[in-house]
UniProtKB/Swiss-Prot annotation:
HAMAP family: KdsB (MF_00057). NCBIfam families: kdsB, PRK05450.1-3, PRK05450.1-5, PRK13368.1. This is 3-deoxy-manno-octulosonate cytidylyltransferase. The gene is kdsB. It holds the Pfam family CTP_transf_3.
Length: 252
């Protein structure tokens, strides 16, 4: 089975313009993501709508493909890039361009989901632990996932799910395993083509989570579990935290 990685990278981020080109430990963020992915998948490309990002990727020797400026999601950008670089792959892996610390184990966990021939789409979750605290569980920027016994996602929400009746909220993390969604997706190539043609759904619009469009239309999402905590970069403050984390790791 052949896997291709696509790393969507936009220049015009509302909260952090030019984020892919921000320097982290002497390298652009997008370069760090690309280097983490290279060698684990059969091939990897950055998909961008901006010539400055294209130039930066070429400068460090990466592969890049230009895509439309009109895409509403990274999934749409992934599909356009896939159609441009060739279709000889079984699975397309969508790697967030703001995850410079994505780990090999996480990519391998997503790949393993496709050992089940019934898997259409796969993603990752990380268990919340009691030490994370209630504030982390309540964070609407960390979507929660309810997972079935077959390891398929039942629902994603920015709210805390499930609600534990007759249990004080402060004790929820001790009495149940909650899962935080990690924004790494993989799709069988034919499924990717299908889901990019779907109109936005009511649940997707309500929660602002595109994966609900797929669930609402009957697609299944297989879930892999990761114990690794990643540091996504959405704001300049996140970049500062990532810089501190990198220095600490390199000093160990």
């Amino acid at each position: 089975m052949k896997f291709i990685g696509i790393i969507p990278a936009r220049y015009a981020s509302t909260r952090f313009p030019a984020k892919p080109l921000a320097v982290l430990g002497g390298k652009p963020v997008i370069q760090r993501v690309y280097e983490q992915v290279s060698g684990i998948l059969d091939e990897a490309y950055v998909a961008t709508d901006d010539e400055r990002i294209e130039s930066a990727v070429k400068a460090f020797g990466g592969k890049v493909v230009m895509t439309s400026v009109h895409h509403k999601s990274g999934t749409d950008r992934c599909y356009e890039a896939y159609t441009k670089v060739g279709r000889g792959y079984d699975v397309v892996v969508n790697i967030q361009g703001d995850e410079p610390f994505i780990q090999k184990s996480q990519l391998e966990a997503v790949k393993a989901c496709f050992e089940d021939p019934a898997t259409q789409i796969a993603t990752l979750v990380k268990p919340f632990i009691p030490d994370d605290g209630l504030e982390a569980l309540e964070n609407v920027n960390s979507p929660k996932v309810v997972v079935g016994k077959n390891m398929n996602a039942l629902y994603f929400s920015r709210s805390i799910i499930p609600f534990q009746r007759n249990v004080e909220k402060e004790g929820w993390l001790k009495g149940h395993t909650y899962y935080k969604h990690i924004g790494l997706y993989a799709y069988r190539a034919d499924v990717l083509k299908e889901i990019t043609s779907l109109p936005q759904s009511s649940l997707e619009l309500a929660e602002s989570l595109e994966q609900l469009r797929w669930l609402e239309n009957g697609y299944t999402i297989k879930v892999g579990i990761s114990e690794v905590e990643t540091i996504g970069i959405d704001t300049p403050q996140d970049l500062a935290r990532a810089e501190a984390f990198l220095k600490q790791r390199e000093g160990e």
